[in-house]
Design a protein with these regions (language model features):
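Protein kinase-like catalytic core scaffold
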Residues: 21-23, 133, 194
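Conserved nucleotide-sensing/catalytic segment adjacent to the nucleotide-binding pocket
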Residues: 100, 104-145, 157
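ATP-dependent carboxylate activation and anion-phosphoryl transfer catalytic cores
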Residues: 1-66
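Short, well-ordered alpha-helices that flank and scaffold nucleotide-derived cofactor binding pockets
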Residues: 51, 78, 82-86, 208, ...
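Walker A (P-loop) phosphate-binding motif
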Residues: 56-105
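A glycine-rich phosphate-binding loop feature that marks nucleotide/adenosyl-phosphate handling sites
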Residues: 6-14, 70, 199-202, 292-296
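Short amphipathic alpha-helices and their capping/turn segments at secondary-structure boundaries
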Residues: 81-84, 140-149
């Protein structure tokens, strides 16, 4: 609440009973002021303050999902938002459709840049009620403002996205575009994951930059990247005979949902990416299927409602 600098004879005694003077009252103390201070037993004062704020094993973070891509990613944020909401998270969403805080659009998008920027992302995180956040990030917002978070739980990339309008930042070729979009994967936590499109050649090198797990998705189980990933025990999502399957390691793939169910609300890449993102956050395949069915039946992609399923 405040930091008080005091000079007195005995700090462990009542100040009103001794000579003392208040040198400074800091209404917004900086934790870094305590970082160089140690107690008699050698413990850092700053560490003690942090330990008192969070229980053992907790770091105060909520799941943060970033997603990027081109036209194939339209509706992706709404699908992830719906699945996390129905999994029990109070979820915020910053997308091209606007800013949605726990199932209520508080800012409909009149200008896309105003709801997919740093400020919109910070609004997702600042609410104490929000338990998970889904944010669209693109090259322009990264270049002009940076990411609204320091680390994320999941980064989803269906493609590098369009390069239009980036010339003023000297982003004139695929290599420079890659260097910008890698940022979203660079900040994934070690216990997080990146969901990447294995059919996009431009995304393949980005997997090496992720500190966490990689979940590939592809339009066919015969994709070479996906096949090698399964041989190494990894998780993946793919399309086969019009059905989206999920698979882990060399175990047989399991059918999850038909692409025809999406009725054009999501592209194949978007649907697989959304499933991979939810799976990365340990949403069970059964709940993913139920969430998507409810999402499609109630028209969440067009008009997310206040309906919620507790689990």
């Amino acid at each position: 609440i405040a930091g008080v600098d005091v000079v007195c004879d005995h700090i462990d005694q009542d100040l009103s009973q001794q000579s003392m003077v208040v040198l400074r009252l800091a209404c917004r103390p900086d934790l870094s002021l305590h970082s160089a201070l140690d107690t008699e037993d050698g413990r850092s004062v700053a560490d003690m303050i942090i330990d008192s704020l969070f229980d053992e094993g907790q770091d105060g973070r909520i799941p943060v999902v970033s997603y990027s891509g081109g036209a194939e990613s339209l509706g992706l944020g709404q699908a992830i938002h719906a699945m996390l909401t129905m999994a029990g998270f109070k979820t915020a969403l910053s997308s091209k459709k606007g800013l949605n805080l726990i199932d209520h659009y508080v800012d409909h998008a009149r200008d896309i840049s105003q709801t997919t920027n740093w400020f919109a992302g910070r609004r997702c995180l600042i609410s104490k009620q929000v338990e998970a956040a889904v944010m669209r990030v693109d090259a322009l917002s990264i270049l002009s403002e940076g990411l609204p978070f320091d680390r994320s739980s999941v980064a989803v990339l269906t493609s590098l996205g369009p390069r239009d309008g980036l010339e003023e930042w000297d982003i004139v070729d695929a290599s420079k575009h890659f260097n910008v979009m890698r940022t979203a994967v660079d900040v994934v936590l070690s216990n997080g994951a990146a969901a990447l499109n294995a059919d996009e050649v431009g995304l393949l090198p980005i997997a090496e930059l992720c500190d966490g797990e990689i979940i590939w998705f592809a339009g066919s189980p015969e994709n070479a990247i996906l096949q090698e990933h399964f041989r190494q025990g990894g998780r993946g999502v793919y399309l086969l005979d019009g059905m989206i399957h999920y698979q882990e390691g060399t175990q047989p793939g399991i059918r999850l949902i038909s692409m025809s169910s999406f009725k054009g609300l999501l592209s194949a890449e978007g649907a697989m990416a959304a499933i991979a993102a939810a799976w990365a956050l340990n949403v069970t395949p059964e709940l993913i299927h139920a969430s998507l069915a409810f999402y499609l039946e109630k028209g969440w992609a067009k008009n997310p409602s206040n309906q919620r399923v507790e689990t």
